[in-house]
From Swiss-Prot:
CDD domains reported in the protein's UniProt record: SerRS_core
InterPro entries, per the entry: aa-tRNA-synt_IIb, aa-tRNA-synth_II, aa-tRNA-synth_II/BPL/LPL, Ser-tRNA-ligase_type_1, Ser-tRNA-synth_1_N, SerRS_1_N_sf, SerRS_core, tRNA-bd_arm
PANTHER family per UniProt: SERINE--TRNA LIGASE, SERYL-TRNA SYNTHETASE
Binding annotation for ATP: 265-267, 352-355
Descriptive protein name: Serine--tRNA ligase
Domain of life: Bacteria
EC number annotated for this UniProt entry: 6.1.1.11
Family, per entry: Belongs to the class-II aminoacyl-tRNA synthetase family. Type-1 seryl-tRNA synthetase subfamily.
Compartments where located: Cytoplasm
Entry keywords, A to Z: Aminoacyl-tRNA synthetase, ATP-binding, Cytoplasm, Ligase, Nucleotide-binding, Protein biosynthesis
Amino acid sequence: MLDLKLLRDRPEQVRQALQNRRATVDLDGILQLDRERRQLETRKGSLQAESNSLGKKVGEIIRQGADPQGPEVAALRQRGVDLKAEIAQLEQQERELEEEIRARLLTLPNLPLPSVPVGRDEADNVEVRRWGEELKPAHPVLPHDEIAEKLGLLEIGRAVKVAQSRFVAMVGAGAALERALIAMMLERHIAAGYTEVIPPFLVNSAALQGTGQLPKFAEDSFRCADDDLWLIPTAEVPLTNLYRDEMIPAESLPLYFCAYTPCFRREAGSYGRDTKGLIRLHQFQKVELVKVTRPDQSEAEHEKLVQDAEAILQMLELPYRVVELCSGDLGFAAARCFDLEVWFPSQNQYREISSCSNCWDFQARRANLRYKEAGQKGTQFVHTLNGSGLAVGRSLAALLENHQQPDGSIRIPKALRPFLSSRFLSEDGILIPAA
């Protein structure tokens, strides 16, 4: 959530930043509501001061000899009753205005940092670096879904029968391979200082509001309406909200969390895109990284977060590139974001496999997540960061294509082999699909 004081003090700067994001918002409407609220606050303060003085005045005139039951005292007491009623009415109006202002603020996206390149969409994103060589073999590379079905690693038709389209079932060596990827990712991140968490896979509306999925993206989430619970779209939601409405001692920061969870998304608006394979599913597995930091730490921690995600791709020997998102392509809560895109030889293109975002204090304001310096008065909002480390299905898909051999077999990267049962691994590191 944006700081209302920032909107009030620098409206044109905010307006330009939102325009760079291609966000259409009614800033003037929010500022008008804020003016009305402050006018009510001023009026209420004046009435409260008068009410306080009335009590003293009644005592004074009685001490001076006025009849406590007389008309003069009665008039003052009636004025006191009227003031309390008017103050109560103003307080109700003030609460209603505050609720409306907050509701509108919750619809505003985060502001891009000044360093973010200005652009309209993904075509204006800026490539930062590449790692590894793009696989362009002389032999044809089967798409990941075709080679996976051919090797018996996944069931699509039967999963659709059980659920609906955009669901798959990993079986046999496919399930073992996915489990190995998860274990490798978690072990690497834990070794880098992250604390593993197994969070709830269902969260309440307040949690989704805290990280920015609500109210804007309700249609893209699965909801259990009877319980006000939602299936998580990413572990970012429960991890970031672990400390919601809390004050963290400054000496405890930064906090690092990692979690493996299934993730659930309706994929609203993606009709006709990536209808086959593991790229765009309603349910998918992901290892998520979340950091909670002091403001002066967040930019350096952002760079380290990207490197942590890159480390997994390097362990899997997958060629990738790092891209900085332009202002028009930023996610709702991000102030700055780097995407990691992995090479898919069957498509002859890079595809996103991780988004690493610095959300600045945007989520912290929504979730009331603060920290306190020892010996200092007051508290400040933390900065929150998150990134995929990595999306498991897309990692598996990229592995099946980039390590596909001319005979159609799959070479398992050396770093992954210790996590895969020997039943599924030949002596020379080739996947045994039917063990």
